[in-house]
Amino acid sequence: MESPIERFRLSQTAKDSLIKLKRYTKIDQWNILCRWAFCRSLAEPSLPSPVPIPADSNVELSWKVFGGEMADIFLIALKQRCHQDGLGTDKETLTQQFRLHLHRGIGYLAGDAKLS
């Protein structure tokens, strides 16, 4: 399945949070932590706040690296969540919602007292 999201860059705030998470969890790969964060946000019933998220860090991942062999499953989960939230599943909406869920999830993980 072809993803509408080819590459994405994290915000500096998200990068800093992931560095902290890497230290606490001993998980070295950005993509693994990003997968956890994305799923954590999808599990939250509320919509992520539609705030602008800067792409101001030097951490950039391709969709294939992010998703690995589960990339199609992550895309289906994103489309299902957009449908559930009454949003479209066009490229722009999917890209925006992915960024919002990813960054919200990183914030949730970084603030989880069980992980620090």
Residue ranges and their predicted role:
Residues 4, 11-32, 36, 60, ...:
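Surface-exposed, Lys/Arg-rich phosphate-binding patches that contact polyanionic backbones
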Residues 28-53, 110, 114:
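Short, basic amphipathic alpha-helical segments that act as recognition/interaction helices
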Residues 31-35, 72, 96, 100:
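Non-catalytic, well-ordered alpha-helical scaffold segments
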Residues 43-85:
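Short, positively charged interaction helices/loops
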Residues 84-116:
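Low-complexity intrinsically disordered segments
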